[in-house]
Amino acid sequence: MKGKLLKGVLSFGIGLGVLYGGSSVQADTSTDQNNTLKVMTHNVYMLSTNLYPNWGQSQRADLIGAADYIKNQDVVILNEVFDNSASDRLLGNLKKEYPNQTAVLGRSNGNEWDKTLGSYSSSTPEDGGVAIVSKWPIVEKIQYVFAKGCGPDNLSNKGFVYTKIKKNDRFVHVIGTHLQAEDSMCGKTSPASVRTNQLKEIQDFIKNKNIPNDEYVLFGGDMNVNKINAENNSDSEYASMFKTLHASIPSYTGHTATWDATTNSIAKYNFPDSPAEYLDYIIASKDHANPSFIENKVLQPKSPQWTVTSWLKKYTYDDYSDHYPVAATISMK
């Protein structure tokens, strides 16, 4: 964010000019920073090592924690921090940069949360895999578990994390979520219909929270709603997402997809022939303070190479996750 006194009246005047000029620039910079919020979301692909032991979860927890791309944000939303050990390691690695953190959604309903709402169950095999870390104090933390999922998602406490964050003299409300996955194991249940209901649960929560309309409300995470080929279709699930959340469409920059098997080594190994998808977003509520500008930029950071061994064969990758991070810049009025 990131003088010396001179002899004589003229020199003294010049010195004052320099001094006050520097203070003005400093004040302007401080004002700009106070009116800008930087929020990132990243699905970090930390599946449980009990089921998926060979995806370098602990290695990547260290690589992500040391990576430049995740630094210098105000708030970071993490998705798929399912593996207990790797997620604890990642959160620990991020603690210096982001000392204010939530627990992982759905892992427990203890006093690390101000409230636990929705359909939390301690008997559900997997947690919800969402956590939020912040540079600024988090003054309220609520976890909410969705009423319904389909396919394997039924075996996790998926939902959303709500945080009320105080940046200097203003409050910002950030919801991090990971919606229902597209899954053939859902049978006759449409994953899109489940996602719509989950979005309605988020919107109902916000409505009932009675947040002052001059405060900013942001939604972020892996929505599992594909923007590609849907932007100009008013009947698309993409359009419906914004309508349901009463959210404004951001400006998009950077890479054209957040999951891309043509450019990402992990995605390529898993699904080499699948088309690219844009699934991860940071968007703002239109029912509350409206940002003068919000941009979603897809980054493509490459990680140092990391290697795993499976059945005596070595596999080497150079990505932090199968998803790319999305960095949002929000200009607040």
Curated annotation (Swiss-Prot):
SUPFAM superfamilies: DNase I-like (SSF56219)
Catalytic activity: a sphingomyelin + H2O = phosphocholine + an N-acylsphing-4-enine + H(+)
EC number(s) on file: 3.1.4.12
Gene3D superfamilies hit by this protein: Endonuclease/exonuclease/phosphatase
GO MF term list: sphingomyelin phosphodiesterase activity
UniProt GO BP: killing of cells of another organism
Cofactor(s) needed: Mg(2+)
Keywords from the named record: Cytolysis, Disulfide bond, Hemolysis, Hydrolase, Secreted, Signal
Signal sequence region: 1-27
Coiled coil stretches, renumbered: none
A Pfam family recorded for this sequence: Exo_endo_phos
Subcellular location: Secreted
Source species, domain of life: Bacteria
Disulfide linkage: C150-C186
Family note: Belongs to the neutral sphingomyelinase family.
Xref: NCBIfam families: sphingomy
Descriptive protein name: Sphingomyelinase C
Upper taxonomic lineage: Bacteria, Bacillati, Bacillota, Bacilli, Bacillales
